[in-house]
A protein has these predicted regions:
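Acidic, low-complexity intrinsically disordered tails
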Residues: 242-253
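Core catalytic lobe of class I
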Residues: 1-238, 247
């Protein structure tokens, strides 16, 4: 059986993923990015540390490791454990092929909290000579350009690296699928409209559904034909108004 995830040791699993993503890097555009979601597992009373093992192995293989993002789950799966905390997060790693890459931070800006907005309104502003000009409310035109983390027009801020996303079961699959809301920022920030999103582990097609919803194209690779057969239904579940698929190909080997 060639399916990844059935290896005898963590090192074998890590090595297989490195090989897969080496091929991904080969065909990726020079300004492309890789967004990798990984959970962890236990064995013999020890946490394997799979996400970071994979991240460092990919970095050693030539990828630029740009950021770790925490997927915080408000509704994690219960665990019958009494000697540690219940696991309620996974990792998403942002990696790139080159030092400079496509990343649309404007597309995924998030709302500021009310306390942030009130604090912003009370802050003193400085003109280009370093002299105070009153609060933002009193001197809106003189707002310092350096305060780029807060946009005065709509009070948006750069997206933070902890994403709280509720897990959502998908009845069409008997295996775990990540929620569309989790990967939406990855696609919006990492791929322009009309671009192509590649998922080497296509599964039920969640990535394709989100990509098509946001006017991107998608290529899925899936070893298991049973999973591949779910793609049409999953796309309709995510994007009910789709008339025709921009899905380029589903590779079954």
């Amino acid at each position: 059986d060639e399916q990844i995830g059935l290896e005898q040791t963590p090192d074998e699993f890590v090595n297989k993923l490195v090989q897969v993503f080496r091929e991904v890097r080969r065909i990726l555009k020079d300004d492309g990015t890789l967004w990798l979601n990984l959970g962890d597992s236990y064995g013999d009373k020890q946490l394997f540390g799979i996400p970071w093992r994979v991240a460092f192995a990919l970095q050693a293989d030539g990828w630029y490791l740009r950021q770790d993002i925490i997927w915080s789950k408000p509704n994690p799966m219960p665990e019958p454990v009494k000697d540690r905390c219940t696991k309620s997060h996974e990792y998403i790693f942002l990696l790139s092929k080159s030092p400079k890459y496509y990343y649309d931070h404007e597309a995924i800006k998030e709302d500021c909290s009310e306390s942030n907005i009130q604090d912003f309104m009370r802050r003193k502003t400085l003109n280009n000579k370093g002299k105070g000009s009153g609060t933002y409310e009193e001197a809106r035109p003189d707002l310092a350009r350096s305060r780029s983390d807060y946009m005065p027009s709509d009070f948006k801020r750069n997206k933070r690296s902890v994403w709280e996303v509720t897990t959502k079961p998908y009845s069409g699959a008997h295996f775990a699928t990540y929620p569309p809301d989790l990967i939406e920022p990855c696609i919006l920030a990492g791929c322009p409209e009309g671009g192509v999103v590649l998922d080497p582990f296509g599964g039920s097609g969640t990535t394709a559904g989100v990509a098509l919803k946001h006017k991107r194209k998608a290529i899925l690779c899936e070893l298991n034909p049973d999973y591949a057969n779910m793609v049409d239904d999953r796309i309709k579940d995510i994007f009910p108004h789709v008339n025709q698929y921009d899905l380029l190909d589903i590779l079954e080997e």
